[in-house]
Amino acid sequence: MILVTGGGGFIGSLLVAELNDLGITDILLVDHKNQKGQDQAIKDKNLAGLKFSKYLEAEELFTDPEFKKISAIYHMGACSSTTERDLEYLKENNIEYSKILFKQAKELNIPMIYASSAATYGSGEQGYSDEHQKIAQYSALNPYGDSKLKFDLWVLEQLALGDTPEHFYGIKFFNVYGPNEYHKG
């Protein structure tokens, strides 16, 4: 079973659709149906027609028995609002939740692909390199970018300690827009 967090959101729902196109339906889909500032009707529309084995609210995941049976993690879930100012909310959703998933990937020896953000680069004054020594030089311009940067830095700390899943990938998304985001157009 493949875990997809943020499965009702823009990127997560398109990922699940692509997995479905590949014939993969044994998916544990996780999201916040009533996430702060999001219209539930939009997520319901994004989920329409998708095939998955089980849906869980984000806070239910860690106590569900299926969590111990997953074979891969696509972590696309987060508070993605660049205008969010609630630092505790961002820490809980974008850093701490991600750390638990990362540790689970290591424990189960499964791959993890997670959504980072170009917001981690800040103004771009330091460039856009993902060389490990450069990442610590970046200064995000908003709390959202800072939360994503903090998780990236934590991952690098785990790498230095040799405490990572065998395969893990952080994807830096740049100002994404497309199908399932029409409400923002």
Language-model segment annotations:
Residues 5, 30, 73-77, 112-118, ...:
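SDR active-site strand-loop-helix element
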